[in-house]
Structures are given as structure tokens and as C-alpha cells.
């Protein structure tokens, strides 16, 4: 080499830094506009366009400006140079250009399907996010918030129905969408719009699995504002929470389906292997998330972290995030892990937190959920113009619109009919119609679709998914209020006051004896509640009966070690607190908080507001497995007075 080389890590570091600041500033202004629009909508009670729909509109406008108002800044970026001395693709490459060495990093392999038509336009390329950002940064707070804010009482009273819709309903939707789309793909091949072999049945099932992920965030927000019938709200919310987890694992299982001989043919062994992968990944992710929540509960119970609310909140956040990262590192699904981590944290850990930490964790995850959700919907609008490999096919888009409506109908109506055969409180027709109408697509479907856009079928799926999200959020989300009126669904119902008065213990005993043969199917459910009340809550929280009264005498040292001192003082009452996150509650807590946050008065007020009821009134006996909704009764704990 003739002269001394000058090493540099980039073309113009200052230029790149300024460009990055401009891109972040653009997103910052989008979020500011979205927040102001939300305030305007709430102030004028405008419900025909939800905040997520407004965020997409602003994203569309910004994408339109970036697409047509910016020009390529590097005309040589699309030029291909041959390197005959390289026989593999290194992760980093040092290139000598006129005695200056530049460092380049590997991004992806370029082929005829993923080459960018806007090569050299640095702004458009930078505004196209790495898909992993959605899964590793934006989705976890949304999913954790869904689990942490779960309305436990209503959720478990409809648990059987929710599980049926979430698991069986998602599988039905996946298969129906896959079959309909396969028919349209064959029509596209016959019409000459696709080559035979470009789009296989497994691709159609993959599209069906990602489009099975419903995200009725718009509808649920309006339901919450109008205080819609709690049973309808719980069915729809519970289905959407678990449906996301099922759809993500189902999509992964289909993507790794690989028969040995023909990768696109049906193979029995490969099919059952995929089913096993689905069950294994789901169970492993569930165990991982629950384990981290149990560790958090034990740490908050047996340490004095509650005396330092900032440390307590920080530990709570980091351990919850670790559940997601550990599941991903272990080859499981972090989204499922963080969902069940949130549910378990709300059920156990929340009771151990100080009053300050209870309020802080609620606010923290509600804020993160709000911000992440609006970033995703803003980016959806942006991606319509900044994504560089869209494939618009009218026949495929038409088939997708038809498929999601047919699949939703095949999901809701048959399963509701079967559930009503066993439910004591039937799911009425107007509820079923509203659930059919509420099958919106949103953040999960978008994130699953954008994660892989390397091939032509995947690019066509992504473009179609984007259009479906726009249509369902704008049209169905905007039509929620008129649909509630047309279906005559009651509104203005308080979620807690709507619960029927609990029957007395004698009435429960008589009813249980009378219907003993009918409630045998709920034996597992009743056993779980008994185990949770007698053993898990006393071990993991400060509530529940002392373990000295529930464990055998020979376990005395262990029971005394694990029993919280507060449990002896509160032995006569049930001190389980439901974790309910909503904006009204947070506002009330701020207004009514005393000058001393750690005072007993403040703690009691916060606990009562967050639970929406007095301690000891949680209905731990009731549950519906979709097989009758009969009341459940726990046996009286030895050494403990009969609970009201």
C-alpha cells in the first residue's frame, strides 16, 4: 500500500448523528400530535375514530411526505461490485477506498424479491425499523400490561369460554383462512398472476395464523369508556389477551413445519411434531414467565424492599423484563412468557408491594403500553409508504377480506352454541354479533407479518395485512358505538357492582349437593382454588391463612419460616387485592393521596380503589369452565373461622 491508511468507522459520523436525530424528532412530533388528538377526542367525546386510527392517519401523512419529498442522497448505493477473493459473507467488512478504510456491517442477502427500489434514499431506509424492535422492545410492555391489568374475578368466572375462544377459536380461524386463501392462490395461478409453486399451502396456513391474531384495542377502549356489560367486555378482552399468545406460537410452529421429503406436502410425522412444538413452546413459556413472577413475589415478601419503593419498582420491572429475555434466549416465546408473568405478578406480587410501588407499577406499565401502542400504529401508517417491497394484488387482498370475516363467523357462532349448552348464563345473540364485529386486526398481526418479508409470498402477506389493519381499525373501530346501539347492548354498567350478591355458605352447600353430578367436571378448578388459597398465597404473599393451620404438624418449622407475620394478624380476613389499571383510578389516587404516601390511611385507600371492593369480598368460589358456570365452594380451613 503506497501511503499510510486512514481508518474511519463511517462516511460521515456527524452526518449520521444528525440524520438519526431528525428521524427520532419526526416520530416524537407524531406522538405529540397523537396525544393532542386524543385529548381533543376525549374532550368532545368523539368515538367515531379511535386514537389508534388517528395515529395511523398521522403516520400515513408523514410517510407520504418522506416518500415523495425526499430524494436519494447516495447514487452509488445500488451499484454491485464483485469481490472474487471472498467466498463467504463476513459480519463486518473493511473496505479501502482511495487510501481510506471504511467499516461496513452485514445486513441481509439481496435477491430479486427484496432489493430496494429506493436504494440510496437514506431517510426511507432508516425509517424502516428492524422487525426485531417490535418483538423485543415494543410488544412486551403491551402484552405485560394486558396480563397485569387483568380483571381476575370476571376473567376466571368466564375462563372456560375464554380458553375455548382463544385456543380452539384461533385454530379454527387459522385453518379457515388458510383454506380460503389457498383457493384464491389457485385462482391467481390460473389467471397468470402467480407462478405455480410460488405460493404453497403452508404459506396460506402461515398467513391464516398471523391473521388469527385479533387486537380489538379500539373496541375495548370504547367499551371501557361506556362501561359496557362486563360479561361481554371480559369475553372479548380475555379472548384477545390469550389469542395473541396462541397466534404467535401457532405462527412459529407453522413456520418450522418441514417434512423430510417434500417441504410443502402434508406429512403426518411432521404435523404431530409441529403440534408437539406448539404445546412444548407454550408450556415452557408459561412456566418461564410464572417462575419469574414467583421469584419476584418471594423477594418482595421476604425482604424489606417495600421500605424503598424506588428499588422495589425497579426490581419488579427488571425481573418482569427478564422473563421475556430468558424465554427468547431459551428458544421459547417471550411474548407468552411475559403475558403469564404479568398475570402471576398481579395475582401474587402485587399484594406484597408497598402502596407507592403499587401505584408506580400501574402508572409505569400503563404509560409504556400507551406509548408503545401508539408508536406501532404510527409506524403502520408510515410503513405504507416507507416499506420498499410492497406487493399489491387485488385478488389476494379480496380473498383475505373475505377469509377473515368467514373465519371469524366460523369461530364465534359454532363455539358460542357449544358453550351455551353448558353455561348457566348463556351468551346471547347480540353478544355474539358484537364479538363477530370486534375481530379487528392490529399490532400483533402487523408485527408477525413484518418479521419476515424476504420472499414474494411474505411481502404480499405483509402488504395485505397492513391494508386489513387499516380497514378494521377505521371502519369497525369507528362503528363500535352505533353497533352497540343497534344491538341494544347495555352500557353504563359498573364492573364490580354488576356482580350478583354472593350466596351464603349454607346456600352454596345445598346447591353443591343438589348439583354434585353436574359439577364433577369442575373438580379440577375447585382443587386449584383450594390449593391456591391454602398454600400458594400464604407462601408467596402476606395474605391467606397461616401455613401452620394448613400444613401437617411435622411441617411446623417450614410453615413457620414461610408464613408472613402479617398472616397471623390478618387471619380473620381475606386480603387478596385485584389489580385493575385504568385512568380514572390513577387520577383518583393522585387527588386523594395524603401527604404521607406510606401512612396507613393512604395504603388502605389505594388498596380499596385498586380492588374496587372491600378486602375479603373476593369471590374465590365461583368459576365457569364453559361447562355450566356452577358455583364452587372451598372446604373450611381447619383452625380458621368460616368466611362470609
Swiss-Prot record:
Residues 1-20, 67-126, 186-203, 257-277, 328-333, 386, 451-465 are lumenal. It is a multi-pass membrane protein. It holds the Pfam family Na_H_Exchanger. GO terms for molecular function: potassium:proton antiporter activity; sodium:proton antiporter activity. Keywords: Antiport, Cell membrane, Cytoplasmic vesicle, Endosome, Ion transport, Membrane, Sodium, Sodium transport, Transmembrane, Transmembrane helix, Transport. Residues 42-45, 148-164, 225-235, 299-309, 351-364, 408-429, 487-644 are cytoplasmic. Expressed in the brain. Highly expressed in immune cells, specifically macrophages. Induction: Down-regulated upon bacterial infection in macrophages. It is found in: Late endosome membrane; Cell membrane; Early endosome membrane; Recycling endosome membrane. Belongs to the monovalent cation:proton antiporter 1 (CPA1) transporter (TC 2.A.36) family. Endosomal Na(+), K(+)/H(+) antiporter. Mediates the electroneutral exchange of endosomal luminal H(+) for a cytosolic Na(+) or K(+). By facilitating proton efflux, SLC9A9 counteracts the acidity generated by vacuolar (V)-ATPase, thereby limiting luminal acidification. Regulates organellar pH and consequently, endosome maturation and endocytic trafficking of plasma membrane receptors and neurotransporters. Promotes the recycling of transferrin receptors back to the cell surface to facilitate additional iron uptake in the brain. This is Sodium/hydrogen exchanger 9. It comes from Mus musculus (Mouse). The gene is Slc9a9.
Amino acid at each position: 500500500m503506497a501511503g499510510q491508511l486512514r481508518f474511519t468507522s463511517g462516511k460521515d459520523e456527524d452526518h449520521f448523528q444528525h440524520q438519526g436525530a431528525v428521524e427520532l424528532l419526526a416520530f416524537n412530533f407524531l406522538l405529540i400530535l397523537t396525544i393532542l388528538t386524543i385529548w381533543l377526542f376525549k374532550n368532545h367525546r368523539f368515538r367515531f375514530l379511535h386514537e389508534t386510527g388517528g395515529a395511523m392517519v398521522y403516520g400515513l401523512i408523514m410517510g407520504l411526505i418522506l416518500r415523495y419529498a425526499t430524494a436519494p442522497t447516495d447514487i452509488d448505493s445500488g451499484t454491485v461490485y464483485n469481490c472474487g477473493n471472498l467466498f463467504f459473507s463476513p459480519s463486518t467488512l473493511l473496505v479501502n477506498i482511495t487510501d481510506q478504510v471504511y467499516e461496513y456491517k452485514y445486513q441481509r442477502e439481496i435477491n430479486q424479491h427484496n432489493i430496494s427500489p429506493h436504494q440510496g434514499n437514506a431517510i426511507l431506509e432508516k425509517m424502516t425499523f428492524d422487525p426485531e424492535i417490535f418483538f423485543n422492545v415494543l410488544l412486551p410492555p403491551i402484552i405485560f400490561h394486558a396480563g397485569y391489568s387483568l380483571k381476575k374475578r370476571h376473567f376466571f368466572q368466564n375462563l372456560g369460554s375464554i380458553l375455548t375462544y382463544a385456543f380452539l377459536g384461533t385454530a379454527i380461524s387459522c385453518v379457515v383462512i388458510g383454506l380460503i386463501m389457498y383457493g384464491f392462490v389457485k385462482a391467481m395461478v390460473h389467471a397468470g398472476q402467480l407462478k405455480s409453486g410460488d405460493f404453497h399451502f403452508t404459506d396460506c396456513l402461515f398467513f391464516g395464523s398471523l391473521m388469527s391474531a385479533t387486537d380489538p384495542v379500539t373496541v375495548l377502549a370504547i367499551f371501557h369508556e361506556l362501561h359496557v356489560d362486563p360479561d361481554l367486555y371480559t369475553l372479548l378482552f380475555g379472548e384477545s389477551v390469550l389469542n395473541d399468545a396462541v397466534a404467535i406460537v401457532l405462527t412459529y410452529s407453522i413456520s418450522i413445519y418441514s417434512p423430510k421429503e417434500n417441504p410443502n406436502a402434508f406429512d403426518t410425522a411432521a404435523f404431530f411434531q409441529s403440534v408437539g412444538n406448539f404445546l412444548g413452546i407454550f408450556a415452557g413459556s408459561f412456566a418461564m414467565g410464572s417462575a419469574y413472577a414467583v421469584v419476584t413475589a418471594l423477594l418482595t415478601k421476604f425482604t424489606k424492599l417495600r421500605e424503598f419503593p424506588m428499588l422495589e419498582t425497579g426490581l419488579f420491572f427488571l425481573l418482569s423484563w427478564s422473563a421475556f429475555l430468558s424465554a427468547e434466549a431459551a428458544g421459547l416465546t417471550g411474548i407468552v412468557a411475559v403475558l403469564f408473568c404479568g398475570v402471576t405478578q398481579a395475582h401474587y406480587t402485587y399484594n406484597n408491594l408497598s402502596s407507592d410501588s403499587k401505584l408506580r407499577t400501574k402508572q409505569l406499565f400503563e404509560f409504556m403500553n400507551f406509548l408503545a401502542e401508539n408508536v406501532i400504529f404510527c409506524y403502520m401508517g408510515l410503513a405504507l409508504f416507507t416499506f420498499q417491497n410492497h406487493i399489491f394484488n387485488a385478488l389476494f387482498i379480496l380473498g383475505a377480506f373475505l377469509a377473515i370475516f368467514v373465519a371469524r363467523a366460523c369461530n364465534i357462532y359454532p363455539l358460542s352454541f357449544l358453550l351455551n349448552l353448558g353455561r348457566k348464563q348463556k351468551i346471547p345473540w347480540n353478544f355474539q354479533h358484537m364479538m363477530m364485529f370486534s375481530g379487528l386486526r392490529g399490532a400483533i398481526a402487523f408485527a408477525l407479518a413484518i418479521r419476515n418479508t424476504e420472499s414474494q409470498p411474505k411481502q404480499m402477506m405483509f402488504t395485505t395485512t397492513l391494508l386489513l389493519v387499516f380497514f378494521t381499525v377505521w371502519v369497525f373501530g369507528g362503528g363500535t358505538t352505533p353497533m352497540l346501539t343497534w344491538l341494544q347492548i347495555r352500557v353504563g354498567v359498573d364492573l364490580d357492582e354488576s356482580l350478583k350478591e354472593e350466596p351464603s355458605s349454607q346456600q352454596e352447600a345445598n346447591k353443591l349437593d343438589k348439583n354434585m353430578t353436574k359439577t364433577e367436571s369442575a373438580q379440577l378448578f375447585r382443587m386449584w382454588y383450594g390449593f391456591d388459597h391454602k398454600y400458594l398465597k400464604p407462601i408467596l404473599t402476606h395474605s391467606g391463612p397461616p401455613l401452620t393451620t394448613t400444613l401437617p404438624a411435622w411441617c411446623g418449622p417450614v410453615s413457620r419460616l414461610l408464613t408472613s407475620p402479617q398472616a397471623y394478624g390478618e387471619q380473620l380476613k381475606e386480603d387478596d387485592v385485584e389489580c385493575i389499571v385504568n385512568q380514572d383510578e390513577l387520577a383518583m389516587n393522585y387527588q386523594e393521596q395524603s401527604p404521607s404516601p406510606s401512612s396507613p390511611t393512604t395504603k388502605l385507600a389505594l388498596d380499596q380503589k385498586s380492588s374496587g371492593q372491600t378486602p375479603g369480598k373476593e369471590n374465590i368460589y365461583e368459576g365457569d369452565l364453559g361447562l355450566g358456570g356452577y358455583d364452587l365452594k372451598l372446604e373450611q380451613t381447619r383452625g380458621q373461622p368460616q368466611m362470609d
